[in-house]
């Protein structure tokens, strides 16, 4: 369990509401409203603490519903509305419109009339509990993971064999914890069939991206026709599990369900992380800003979705696109909630041109005024546990004109390749080995080792060079790169 500085929340009080809209009943309006915004979680077997899919359920929880809706706690949705558009740009926007709130408050204020059952919508159904429908394949842990009663647990990495006999294109993914009460989040990565305990694949690090995901508020990835992710023949799935003990020793066996595309897609869906892993948040800082970017995107892309990820001190987040000297805010979250790490999916993909910059900015509250802060007297840096912090701006995207299976331009490998090209001012290194060529350029003091500061000095416009890429090359973790370690760059960029 993670301690908080103070107990968050306040007493619930009933507020008087207008008794206008007296014709609003459960069956003619409220049932539909709850189906659209609430029932996906608040149903039997859902992640919500109680169901809201019947009249009796809605009436029993009416005072609480009004309070949490009025305070903006529910439904969980934190993006600022784009006032330049009449409709939300987000296809999964859970927020209630002003008219929907009026209807809900009027119904509760008028003593929750039931109305005519004939006007009620058809109840939503969920196939065998799977939100994505019946999966074509389900993979589960070979044996449960034991979760202790108290304290913290390091991330558990569980590898599951798929035994797939051919490459598959996947149109829908759902991660289902066996014990949701102790699973805070899950990241799933693809691991090649020939890798056991050796170096992880390019994506097997939360800083690089994810293949599948389970976080509070999001357990599915569903793509329209023509869009899919690939899982290779014989691949393994690496589940990175973040468990949060809840006072009782227990165990968990998580599953993942996949729905295969009927044919090869037109677009391969990819994920990149906009990351700053080198930040330090001072003790007591109540609005500490951290910035990361992908400068000069190497090729045209279309963004499908964003998923910002921070921990308990996360306060606010924003994605910006810098193009032609102008800055455009793409997603603004002034009130970030660690308990609801939501995916924000565009109704229509948004184009980003080669040379544009994607920037992810986050603000952190490490003060005693943050009731969820475990320790306001501590300097905080990057780390895997909840009491540590992260600065991760995930971007889900496609590359127009590329073929499924082509190299990923925003992966660490793709970005390293682009950084090397830019560094040499051309299409690549003139040397047989990129690492040897770089060593000569980076070893400014001639001591035979490359420090993080030396890399930062040469790549000051590319934070990934001195963080993500540096860490991947520093195999002995001594904070220095020797010539042998830097030669591994040839493997990373495919030279």
Language-model segments: what does each one mean?
Residues 449-463, 483-494:
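Amphipathic regulatory helices of Ca2+-sensor modules
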Residues 1-6:
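Bacterial N-terminal signal peptides
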Residues 8-160, 164, 172, 176, ...:
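Aromatic- and Gly/Pro-enriched helix-to-coil junctions and flexible linker segments
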Residues 26-27, 107, 439, 470, ...:
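Conserved hydrophobic/aromatic "anchor" residues
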């Amino acid at each position: 369990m993670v301690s908080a500085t103070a107990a968050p929340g306040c007493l619930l009080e009933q507020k008087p509401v207008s008794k206008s809209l007296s014709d609003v009943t459960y069956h003619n309006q409220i049932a539909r409203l709850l189906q659209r915004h609430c029932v996906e979680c608040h149903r039997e077997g859902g992640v919500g603490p109680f169901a809201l899919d019947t009249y009796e359920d809605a009436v029993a929880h009416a005072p609480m519903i009004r309070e949490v809706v009025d305070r903006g706690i529910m439904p969980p949705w934190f993006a600022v509305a784009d006032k330049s558009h009449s409709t939300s740009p987000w296809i999964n926007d859970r927020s209630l419109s002003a008219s929907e709130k009026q209807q809900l408050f009027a119904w509760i204020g008028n003593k929750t009339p039931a109305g005519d059952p004939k006007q009620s919508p058809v109840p939503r159904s969920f196939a065998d509990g799977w939100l994505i429908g019946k999966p074509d394949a389900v993979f589960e842990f070979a044996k449960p993971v034991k979760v202790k009663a108290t304290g913290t647990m390091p991330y558990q990495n569980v590898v599951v064999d798929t035994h797939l006999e051919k490459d598959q294109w996947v149109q829908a993914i759902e991660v289902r914890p066996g014990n949701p009460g102790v699973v805070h989040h899950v990241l799933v990565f693809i691991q090649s069939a020939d890798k056991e305990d050796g170096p992880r694949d390019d994506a097997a690090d939360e800083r690089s991206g994810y293949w599948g995901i389970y976080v509070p508020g999001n357990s599915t990835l569903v793509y329209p026709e023509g869009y899919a992710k690939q899982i290779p023949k014989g691949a393994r799935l690496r589940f990175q599990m973040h468990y949060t003990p809840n006072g009782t020793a227990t165990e968990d066996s998580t599953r993942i369900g996949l729905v295969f595309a009927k044919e090869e897609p037109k677009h391969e869906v990819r994920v990149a992380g906009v990351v700053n892993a080198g930040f330090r948040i001072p003790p007591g800082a109540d609005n500490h800003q951290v910035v990361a970017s992908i400068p000069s995107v190497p090729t045209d892309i279309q963004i499908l979705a964003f998923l910002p990820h921070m921990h308990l001190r996360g306060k606010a987040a924003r994605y910006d696109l810098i193009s032609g000297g102008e800055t455009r805010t793409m997603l603004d979250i002034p009130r970030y909630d660690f308990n609801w790490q939501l995916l924000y999916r565009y109704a229509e993909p948004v184009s980003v041109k080669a040379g544009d910059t994607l920037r992810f900015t986050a603000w952190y509250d490490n003060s005693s005024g943050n009731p969820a802060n475990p320790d306001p007297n501590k300097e905080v840096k990057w780390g895997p546990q909840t009491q540590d912090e992260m600065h991760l701006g995930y971007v889900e995207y496609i590359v127009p004109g590329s073929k499924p299976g082509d190299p990923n331009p925003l992966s660490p490998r793709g970005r390293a390749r682009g950084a090397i090209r830019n560094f040499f001012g051309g299409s690549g290194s003139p040397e047989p080995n990129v690492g040897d060529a770089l060593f000569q350029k980076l070893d400014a003091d001639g001591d035979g080792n490359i420090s993080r500061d030396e890399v930062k000095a040469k790549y000051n416009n590319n934070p990934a060079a001195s963080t993500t890429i540096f860490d991947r090359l520093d195999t002995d973790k001594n904070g220095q790169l020797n010539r042998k370690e830097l030669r591994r760059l040839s493997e990373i960029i495919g030279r």
